[in-house]
Regions:
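Juxtamembrane cytosolic/matrix-side boundary and N-terminal portion
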Residues: 541, 659-670
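Classical eukaryotic N-terminal signal peptides for Sec-dependent ER targeting/secretion
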Residues: 1-9, 393, 667-680, 689-691
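Compact interaction modules built on cysteine/histidine frameworks
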Residues: 543, 547, 552-556, 636, ...
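Alpha-helical coiled-coil scaffolding segments
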Residues: 200, 581-582
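Charged, amphipathic alpha-helical segments
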Residues: 475-486, 563-568
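Short, surface-exposed tryptophan/glycine-enriched loops
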Residues: 193, 384-402, 409-411, 516-581, ...
Length: 691
């Protein structure tokens, strides 16, 4: 739900020009509303429903536990923005647990997600079509995760039977009629799964929940957690542990790999090089030309000094001839989800020459007999050096068993460094559509100017950019439609598109992230004081600006969040790391959700490769051992299944494979079928004539 605040500001879009641009914020001044505030305004005393004629559900009872994937229906009364947030929340569950969700087919038990009066759910699986309400103001990541945790069988954290050892409930400060929200759950009806009390749980009330105005209702016995309880970013790591233990998860639905090279572990990766001096990827603590330390142990705003010494992988380009390469390849992974889309996230540091190149490939294997595989170039990094570790995302679309290859290639110039990588994560969810990294954060925070991202394009051609402005105690975060090269071909206004802005938690392991994100969706009802739709073609109702390339463009209103995050949140966890703050963003088409409960599989945007490699593929660094013989052909053909539609990156150069000398893939490198039959006959005769 959006509340529009109209402002007009003079924005510096270049060192020479300022233009008056309309600013239309979708947030109210202050923090987003919490569940208790939303429900109190709706005259609801709790966000937990009690089923009539059914004993209160217990997370100790397996009868109330769902089978995964959990069937659901996004009902028509849901706001379109809420639908998009719910699907994003499902991806977080998939990333961190074995819980999956799917649109209902004919299952008896399912969750009916509706827009009712407030935010609420039953605890556990109760009956067919049980309602879960994401009402007005409830469409945030944390609230959606909170309500679905109820549906999965979890009570509030402060309702634990052992809560009195950790918090004190001040009943005299609770508004009359709301005392039941602070009842404890009986030990026989619940379990804590052997985990400690979690002040950081997304299921914990805040300190002022249901206050009558006389002070806090919850006081932590350890004062340092008083401002922690009630966080509304994401599931905490302990929330995830408890969920996985309760559902006996052995693995996650959508996570494949994490490697920070800590304890000098290569995580099953292999290296090889094609150079005369045997230089290649090495595990180091620091590298000539930089960086001086790994990314994992960089100091954060919440821990000013890095206390550990870590490792990262470095490939030097300081010696060797132009075109020499060194490769780092991951272990083999198997796509498991119906949508064949993966996201590779890593941090890199470039201290070499601007002509040096880091190529990112995937190598797919047809079956267990394929030891060579076929590789495709999915991304490329080149250009000027970096002064900080920088985040990078590469969208993948592997349909078979695959591995990722990082290939460092020496350029034509003089290098004194090379490429370094650290903190690799690979998952089966869609990558963010872009990122904006603010290095030298402390300096930027004291500078009140606006920082813009480069111009971005959606998969179907709409142009936009992101704008961040620091205000000392908080920062503003907005997006802005721009004129682009496809404007005449597009449908205007640009409607039912969800903009998600995320302040990234830079914790090394993606599964431990508690990023802060907020989403809004473009609507036909978003109009300014002149009655013009905010999302119309900027060439019609926009203002002339100068973009990052000093090119003239037209820009629509800036729209987003005046107070995206306050300083106390920014300084917590790992939001600022190595003096860098990272914003990721996605601009998602939600039009299919008007009638459906799921989105189609994501399409990959075309990838621009500046320097297509010309050399032949020499195969993987380590060839796996394949079976000696193939199984006999099947007499019946299995039904052919087609993978979901994806758009492959636009090919810029074809990689030529060397011709195979034989179709037999025996580990011995030759086939008996290639031996001439007269020779076999002679050998057989000699054997028979021997005494």
């Amino acid at each position: 739900m959006k509340v529009f605040i109209f402002l007009v500001l003079g924005l510096a879009v270049s060192s020479a020009d300022t233009d008056e641009l309309e600013i239309i914020d979708v947030d109210e001044v202050g923090q987003p509303k919490d569940i208790t505030e939303i429900n109190r305004a709706s005259n609801l005393s709790d966000d937990i429903l009690e089923a009539p004629n059914i004993q209160r559900s217990s997370i100790n009872d397996d009868d109330y536990i769902w089978e995964s994937p959990v069937p659901y229906v996004l009902e028509n009364d849901l706001e379109i923005n809420a639908k998009g947030v719910i699907l994003r929340a499902f991806d977080e569950y998939r990333l961190k647990s074995c819980i999956d969700f799917r649109p209902r087919n004919e299952e008896y038990y399912y969750i009916s997600v509706r827009k009712l009066n407030g935010c609420f759910s039953y605890v556990g699986r109760i009956f067919s079509g049980q309602p879960l309400s994401i009402g007005r103001f409830c469409d945030s990541m944390a609230i959606v995760q909170h309500e679905f945790l109820h549906a999965l069988g979890f009570f509030h954290e402060q309702s634990r039977y052992d809560r009195d050892d950790h918090v004190k409930i001040l009943f005299e400060n609770i508004e009359k009629g709301f005392e039941n929200n602070f009842e404890k759950v009986n030990k026989t009806d619940s379990t804590v799964s052997g985990l400690p009390y979690d002040y950081n749980s997304v299921m914990h009330y805040g300190s002022e929940a249901f206050s009558n105005g006389n002070g806090s209702t919850i006081v932590t016995k350890d004062p340092k957690f008083q401002d922690v309880i009630g966080q509304r970013q994401q599931l905490s790591p302990i929330d995830v542990k408890e969920l996985n233990r309760r559902y006996k998860c052995k693995s996650t639905t959508a996570f494949h790999m994490f490697c920070s090279f800590s304890n000098e572990s290569m995580c099953g990766m292999n290296t090889c090089s094609h150079s005369d001096n045997d230089s290649g990827w090495e595990m180091v603590k620091q590298a000539q030309g930089g960086p001086e330390t790994d990314h994992s142990t960089l100091p954060t705003a919440s821990s000013k000094n890095g206390t550990e010494e870590g490792y990262f992988m470095h490939a030097s380009t300081a010696s060797g001839e132009e075109g020499e390469t060194s490769r780092l390849e991951t272990k083999m992974m198997e796509p498991t989800r119906e949508c064949h889309v993966q996201c590779l996230q890593f941090y890199y540091y470039h201290s070499g020459d601007e002509s040096d190149i880091l190529n990112i490939w995937i190598r797919e294997f047809d079956d267990q007999f394929d030891s060579e595989g076929t590789r495709r170039l999915m991304g490329q990094i080149t250009g000027p050096q970096t002064s900080h570790w920088r985040i990078h995302h590469v969208s993948l679309n592997a349909t078979k068993n695959f591995q990722v290859e990082f290939e460092a290639r020496t350029g034509a110039g003089n290098s004194s460094g090379g490429f370094s990588i650290d903190d690799i994560n690979l998952s089966e969810i869609e990558c963010p559509h872009g990122s904006l990294q603010i290095d030298n954060y402390m300096e930027s925070n004291n500078n009140k100017s606006i920082i813009y991202s480069p111009r971005q394009y959606t998969i179907d051609g709409y142009a936009y950019r992101i704008a961040i402005q620091f205000k000392g105690a908080y920062f503003s975060l907005r997006m802005q439609m721009l004129s682009g090269e496809n404007d005449e071909k597009l449908q205007w206004p640009c409607l039912q598109r969800q903009m998600t802005l995320r302040m990234l938690d830079q914790t090394t392991n993606l599964q431990l992230h508690m990023s802060a994100e907020r989403s809004f969706t473009t609507s036909p009802y978003d109009v300014n004081n002149l009655g013009l739709n905010l999302w119309d073609n900027p060439r019609r109702n926009g203002t002339e600006v100068v973009d990052e390339n000093n090119q003239t463009a037209f820009a629509g209103p800036l729209s987003g969040y005046r107070t995206f995050a306050f300083d106390d949140l920014i300084q917590s966890r790992n939001y600022v790391k190595g003096d860098s703050l990272i914003i990721t963003f996605s601009f998602q088409d939600l039009n299919p959700l008007i009638k459906e409960s799921a989105l189609p599989c994501p399409e990959l945007a075309p990838v621009m490769i500046a320097h297509p490699p010309l050399d032949l593929d020499s195969g993987p660094c380590v060839r796996r051992i394949t079976p000696v013989t193939r199984p006999p052909p099947s007499t019946t053909k299995p039904p052919r299944t087609m993978p979901p539609k994806t758009t492959h990156p636009t090919p810029t150069h074809s990689t030529t494979m060397p011709p195979k000398t034989t179709d037999d893939k025996s580990i011995f490198g030759f086939s008996p079928a290639m031996v001439a039959s007269p020779v076999l006959t002679l050998l057989l005769a000699l054997m028979l004539s021997m005494p």
